[in-house]
Amino acid sequence: MLRRKPSNASEKEPTQKKKLSLQRSSSFKDFAKSKPSSPVVSEKEFNLDDNIPEDDSGVPTPEDAGKSGKKLGKKWRAVISRTMNRKMGKMMVKALSEEMADTLEEGSASPTSPDYSLDSPGPEKMALAFSEQEEHELPVLSRQASTGSELCSPSPGSGSFGEEPPAPQYTGPFCGRARVHTDFTPSPYDHDSLKLQKGDVIQIIEKPPVGTWLGLLNGKVGSFKFIYVDVLPEEAVGHARPSRRQSKGKRPKPKTLHELLERIGLEEHTSTLLLNGYQTLEDFKELRETHLNELNIMDPQHRAKLLTAAELLLDYDTGSEEAEEGAESSQEPVAHTVSEPKVDIPRDSGCFEGSESGRDDAELAGTEEQLQGLSLAGAP
């Protein structure tokens, strides 16, 4: 009886094994085989302008199994790049079509419609459509930007909202003047300090005890340090003020503290001053900056007005006293001239006595000369 010899796959001939491995590699598209990278292929991977024919399926046939793996890898890379390009193009066109849906005409076919298939125009036509949509979108964006700029930028005739109307210039009162002896340039971030130049004259508005004063220079109100200035004496100006007031015929001196505060528009501080001992104008003349700090009057304009009023009141009183003294001194010579006839009588007699004694001395001198002449004549 004949027995069949068992077959073993491992005992096959080498030629059969080689053919079997070749068939397997061609059936599985040779994915496991390493592909050499080419710089030319990498540059064309995601190029939308790459023209690949539509009828080329890219699937290798059994006749191409004997060709080199390099050519097979290039074909598969081209197929993959074409598929990716189409997917990316679909996504970009879909996004643009959604944005431009309101502006496009009705009835225009959308690339994302169900009629769109793989047989649609190639990458070149898709790139052309994409560029046309970009050109169509640019004018819309430019119009939107122009309208936005027109809304944001004000017209030449209308005033801008950011600019504030200029504040009125401060006109007083002032509590003194000071001349700058040292140049000082403030920081560009410090908008409250004054730029000082040697020789400038500052009108002082307030002199707080901390050392940073408030003044007016070149039409600008700002702060400055007292170490850069020398305070100018105000005595001459203070004495001249009453005369100017009298010459101009202004209102006379107030009689009460309440009347004074009404004139300078600070009636609100009347009760504060009265409760702290400033009940008369004589008391108000002694008002100083330290007293204002004790009274908790911190408004710079109110402080300047009160201090200026106190100084003017003091100057007014001192000027009136000096005027009275001058009037008295001018009246004294008149009194002396009236009393001169009574007082000059004994003085005249005294003068006569002096003249007689002088006359006697002259006579004695004459007699002595005569005696000398006689003695000379009698000599041999």
Curated annotation (Swiss-Prot):
Pfam families: SAM_1 (PF00536), SH3_2 (PF07653), SPIDER (PF12485). SMART domains: SAM, SH3. The modification Phosphoserine is found at S27, S34, S42, S97, S110, S113, S120, S320. Residues 1-76, 98-174, 237-256, 318-380 are annotated as: Disordered. Residues 241-255 have a biased composition (Basic residues). The gene is SASH3. Residues 173-234 form the SH3 domain. The keyword Phosphoprotein applies. Residues 143-152 have a biased composition (Polar residues). Gene3D superfamilies: SH3 Domains, Transcription Factor, Ets-1. This is SAM and SH3 domain-containing protein 3. Residues 22-41, 153-164 have a biased composition (Low complexity). Residues 318-327 have a biased composition (Acidic residues). One of its GO terms (biological process) is positive regulation of organ growth. Keywords: Disease variant, Phosphoprotein, SH3 domain. May function as a signaling adapter protein in lymphocytes. The keyword DNA damage does not apply. It is linked to Immunodeficiency 102: An X-linked recessive disorder characterized by recurrent sinopulmonary, cutaneous and mucosal infections, and refractory autoimmune cytopenias that appear in early childhood. Affected individuals have bacterial, viral, and fungal infections, as well as hemolytic anemia, thrombocytopenia, lymphopenia, and decreased NK cells. The disorder may also manifest as a hyperinflammatory state with immune dysregulation. GO terms for cellular component: cytoplasm; nucleus. The modification Phosphothreonine is found at T61, T103, T112, T318. The modification Phosphotyrosine is found at Y116. SUPFAM superfamilies: SAM/Pointed domain, SH3-domain. Residues 252-316 form the SAM domain.
